[in-house]
Amino acid sequence: MRVLLACLLVCALVVSDSDGSNEVHKESGESNCGCLNGGKCVTYKYFSNIQRCSCPKKFQGEHCEIDTSKTCYQGNGHSYRGKANRDLSGRPCLAWDSPTVLLKMYHAHRSDAIQLGLGKHNYCRNPDNQRRPWCYVQIGLKQFVQFCMVQDCSVGKSPSSPREKEEFQCGQKALRPRFKIVGGQVTNAENQPWFAAIYRRHRGGSITYLCGGSLISPCWVVSATHCFIDHPKKENYIVYLGQSRLNSDTRGEMQFEVEKLILHEDYSAESLAHHNDIALLKIRTSRGQCAQPSRSIQTICLPPEHEDAHSRTRCEITGFGKENPSDYRYSDELKMTFVSLVSHEVCQQPHYYGAEVTDKMLCAADPQWETDSCQGDSGGPLVCTIQGRLTLTGIVSWGRDCAMKYKPGVYTRVSKFLPWINTHTRGEINLVL
């Protein structure tokens, strides 16, 4: 009873606010505490003049930095200060001040942690301007950056002013490439809006980039069968559209599950060549939607069934592939380069590939043998102009090394597989230019 009375007396003293020398707490300048969002710095006399932020309604945290009213994020979520704390798979986020996170680049002990929204909590944030809020998640023995289960405020809302609905127009680009680098050009999704980045899921939840692909309709991506032959289950893969950098968010990108994975029934691989190397992926978001058109997401036209680009036609190839086969990592940035089609007669010569090249394949190379598709570009697009429109002429399939003289890249000839595409998509794709 005495202990209880003593506790009650102390509590009464702490919460009272008398005048003069009996004052328990007082407001100080905000600079002493770093209070945000209208919080007031309060000094508690009976607790060794400890200063704390007194937060207004809807805010909490050491500096009033947490907005409890926020249930969605604006833009890319850089300013999001809500309380979402799980990734898209439902895994809990690690606290920003946990020992393992303190070893990462972004953590609660950074000098700019308050400005970035990082602190003694595990709420999702976007300190580095990725596509959406994220957090570190423990998967097995490692920590991974994972996007968070928090809603985009713009989803489901009508724009304040009416605007014309965007529609898919195959082969249309928003931008032209600009920055030259060795072996090609750094590009972005707005310049290659049909490019699909295909990732493979691993045990434990991590994902790694696998192959490229091309969006040929809102629900369908075409790629190469050899990318999936060792792991043919659709659940193993995630597809991103509108992505300009590997393992990093690009504003406007979309993530998809694979609803169907269709590998060519007659696919075969010899010592080097891949035959019938084509695959289809039917894609859906977690909400069951297909792709939506934007500046960074667009379909590529399919070729006429009986017409291909002529030899020496200048075409584009795109991907995150390696500069050299011996490179340890893929390119961090999406790249494109130009190659020219090599005639069938030339590519079948003995010092090229001989009889390994069939009429269902195309060859293309840089005339100076300096740029080429390489490992990691598999499944990606070879885009040529046919009848004045950018058209998916080939799919990156195989070749010997990268940019090796007399060994051009070999591509699946898309025009030879239009009936197969039509059969498996059940006529969902318009095959007429």
UniProtKB/Swiss-Prot annotation:
Disulfide bonds join C33-C41, C35-C53, C55-C64, C72-C153, C93-C135, C124-C148, C170-C301, C211-C227, C219-C290, C315-C384, C347-C363, C374-C402. Residues 154-180 are annotated as: Connecting peptide. Transmembrane segments: none annotated. GO terms for cellular component: cell surface; extracellular space; protein complex involved in cell-matrix adhesion; serine protease inhibitor complex; serine-type endopeptidase complex. Residues 181-426 form the Peptidase S1 domain. Residues 36-59 are annotated as: Binds urokinase plasminogen activator surface receptor. Induction: By retinoic acid. Inhibited by SERPINA5. Inhibited by SERPINE1. Residues 1-20 form the signal peptide. It catalyses: Specific cleavage of Arg-|-Val bond in plasminogen to form plasmin. GO terms for biological process: fibrinolysis; plasminogen activation; positive regulation of cell migration; regulation of cell adhesion mediated by integrin; regulation of cell population proliferation; regulation of smooth muscle cell migration; regulation of smooth muscle cell-matrix adhesion; response to hypoxia. Pfam families: Kringle (PF00051), Trypsin (PF00089). Residues 29-65 form the EGF-like domain. InterPro entries: EGF-like_dom, Kringle, Kringle-like, Kringle_CS, Kringle_sf, Peptidase_S1_PA, Peptidase_S1_PA_chymotrypsin, Peptidase_S1A. Its EC number is 3.4.21.73. This is Urokinase-type plasminogen activator. It comes from Bos taurus (Bovine). The lineage of its organism: Eukaryota, Metazoa, Chordata, Craniata, Vertebrata.
